[in-house]
Amino acid sequence: MSRSVGTLTRADLAEAINRKMGFSRAESLDMVEAILEHMCGALRKGENVKISGFGSFVLRDKKERIGRNPKTGVEVPITPRRVMTFRASQLLRERIAKGG
């Protein structure tokens, strides 16, 4: 299976808004920035972010646990921390599986 690897950037999102919605490039970039900042703000406050038909950014608190240094084998404590995971919606998974 051959696939080219690319990266979708903020500028790409702004360009898509510019083309589809007719906003200026600056307005489009401001929209992208505002949306991302709103999402980051919600996550900072401990809220999960759900985008219907796309997926959810979910915060999880991980407890302290004992890990092991792979080089030395010495046990070391891993401190408690908050991690963010992304879970794609069923619709997004189906669209990706179909190639579009």
Curated annotation (Swiss-Prot):
Chain segments annotated as transmembrane: none
GO CC terms in record: cytosol
Superkingdom of origin organism: Bacteria
One GO molecular-function entry: structural constituent of chromatin
Keyword terms of this UniProt record: DNA recombination, DNA-binding, Transcription, Transcription regulation, Translation regulation
PROSITE patterns, per database record: HISTONE_LIKE
Pfam families: Bac_DNA_binding (PF00216)
Biological process according to GO: DNA recombination; positive regulation of metabolic process; regulation of DNA-templated transcription; regulation of translation
Similarity comment: Belongs to the bacterial histone-like protein family.
Primary role: This protein is one of the two subunits of integration host factor, a specific DNA-binding protein that functions in genetic recombination as well as in transcriptional and translational control.
Subunit composition and interactions: Heterodimer of an alpha and a beta chain.
HAMAP family tied to this protein: IHF_alpha (MF_00380)
Protein name: Integration host factor subunit alpha
Highest classification ranks of the organism: Bacteria, Pseudomonadati, Pseudomonadota, Alphaproteobacteria, Sphingomonadales
Gene responsible for this protein: ihfA
